[in-house]
From Swiss-Prot:
Organism: Citrifermentans bemidjiense (strain ATCC BAA-1014 / DSM 16622 / JCM 12645 / Bem) (Geobacter bemidjiensis)
NCBIfam families from the UniProt entry: rplN_bact
HAMAP family for the chain: Ribosomal_uL14 (MF_01367)
A Gene Ontology term for the protein's cellular component: cytosolic large ribosomal subunit
Family: Belongs to the universal ribosomal protein uL14 family.
Protein's name in the database: Large ribosomal subunit protein uL14
SUPFAM superfamilies: Ribosomal protein L14
């Protein structure tokens, strides 16, 4: 579960390293974001000479959460960190590589490009 002021790791090579959640998109009173949800975030740490700079306001999709997510078959999946992938307005990743596993829930949310770039889908 991601809410306002949550710090996330970045799971792509866009150049950002840490994101700070500013807003959860999808309704005026929406409080939490889960896997596959889009957030508005500020870049808190970034590599030099990268596509995104420190202080940039970007959109990101949540790909891993430390809070367990229930699946229809009764199983749960959770990760060690909260992570996101920086996306553009067309919902495509800014980076060209994805690091670490991503959850299968992204497929239902139509993030096929992220699924195809990820080394593992759990």
């Amino acid at each position: 579960m991601i809410q306002m002021q949550t710090l996330l790791d970045v799971a792509d090579n866009s150049g950002a390293k840490k994101l700070f959640c500013i807003k959860v998109l999808g309704g005026s009173k929406r409080r939490y974001a889960g896997i596959g949800d889009i957030i508005v975030a500020s870049v808190k740490e970034a590599l030099p000479n990268s596509k995104v700079k420190k202080g940039d306001v970007v959109k990101a999709v949540v790909v891993r959460t430390a809070k367990a997510v229930g699946r229809p078959d009764g199983s749960y999946i959770r990760f060690d960190t909260n992570s996101g992938v920086v996306i553009n307005n067309a919902k495509e990743p800014v980076g060209t590589r994805i690091f670490g596993p991503v959850a299968r829930e992204l497929r239902a949310k139509k993030f096929m490009k992220i699924i195809s770039l990820a080394p593992e889908v759990l």
